[in-house]
């Protein structure tokens, strides 16, 4: 009797040391299938490897370019022009624009401005622009027709493929002698793709600030502008 009891005890111990063969019931199978489907939906099946980054990220994120600009990184010439009535005389505005040695004192982002040479109707200038420690220099030939025209064209080709700035002054409103009509235009194309993309982002704002800076300079030198009736004001802007 004791021997049979010992044999049954040993059999129970042995059966606990070996895996049992179990029959999977239909309910168990359904539960397992649900678990597998749930895991698959969550994308966390253990035996799956993570997909590469490009497959995980949305296409619109992967397609973004530098500064999130959707256009391709290609140089494009930018052009801007405007016509407006100013409350200063032709001579006053001509003197402000042609005084390039003073640009460093009032033109936004102009850190240094020098007249390299000068002769009748022309001068050669060198400007340093930018934000320290990133500064760029370029040289321009300036055509001067007093008091009608100041035209600056970049000549060194290191920073720009093309740069031309034109200020034209003509008589203003009849009956308002201290006014003039300004026709301003600028066109440029950077050599650097980075500069070109920055220009695309900030071009309009930079140009507006630049024109406003010349008006403030005229106000500082010659006092408040002539008061022009609102119905006679003219301001047209074109840019590409």
UniProtKB/Swiss-Prot annotation:
UniProt-listed Gene3D superfamilies: 3.30.530.20
InterPro entries xref list: COQ10-like, COQ10_START, START-like_dom_sf
Pfam family, one: Polyketide_cyc
Bilayer topology term: Peripheral membrane protein
Source taxon at top rank: Eukaryota
Transmembrane segments: none
GO terms for MF: ubiquinone binding
Boundaries of the annotated transit peptide in chain numbering: 1-39
GO BP annotations, alphabetical order: cellular respiration
Keywords: Membrane, Mitochondrion, Mitochondrion inner membrane, Transit peptide
Annotated compartments: Mitochondrion inner membrane
Subunit structure and binding partners: Interacts with coenzyme Q.
Protein function: Required for the function of coenzyme Q in the respiratory chain. May serve as a chaperone or may be involved in the transport of Q6 from its site of synthesis to the catalytic sites of the respiratory complexes.
Family stated for the protein in its record: Belongs to the COQ10 family.
Name of the protein in question: Coenzyme Q-binding protein COQ10 homolog B, mitochondrial
Organism: Mus musculus
Gene: Coq10b
């Amino acid at each position: 009797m004791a021997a049979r009891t010992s044999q049954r005890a040993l059999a129970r111990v042995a059966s606990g040391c070996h895996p049992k063969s179990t029959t999977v019931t239909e309910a168990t199978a359904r539960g397992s299938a649900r678990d597998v489907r749930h895991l698959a939906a969550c994308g966390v099946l253990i035996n799956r490897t993570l997909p590469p980054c490009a497959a995980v990220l949305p296409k619109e994120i992967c397609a973004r370019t530098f500064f999130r600009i959707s256009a391709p990184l290609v140089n494009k010439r930018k052009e801007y022009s405007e016509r407006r009535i100013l409350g200063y005389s032709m001579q006053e505005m001509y003197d402000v624009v042609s005084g390039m040695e003073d640009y460093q004192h009032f033109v936004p982002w102009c850190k240094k401005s020098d007249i390299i040479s000068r002769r009748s109707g022309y001068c050669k200038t060198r400007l340093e622009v930018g934000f320290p420690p990133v500064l760029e220099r370029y040289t321009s030939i300036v055509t001067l027709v007093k008091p009608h025209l100041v035209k600056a064209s970049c000549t060194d080709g290191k920073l720009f493929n093309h740069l031309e700035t034109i200020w034209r002054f003509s008589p203003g409103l009849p009956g308002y002698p201290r006014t003039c009509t300004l026709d301003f235009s600028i066109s440029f194309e950077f050599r650097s793709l980075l500069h070109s993309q920055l220009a695309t982002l900030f071009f309009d704002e930079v140009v507006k600030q630049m024109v406003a800076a010349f008006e403030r300079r005229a106000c500082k030198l010659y006092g408040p502008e002539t008061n022009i009736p609102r119905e006679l004001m003219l301001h047209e802007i074109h840019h590409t």
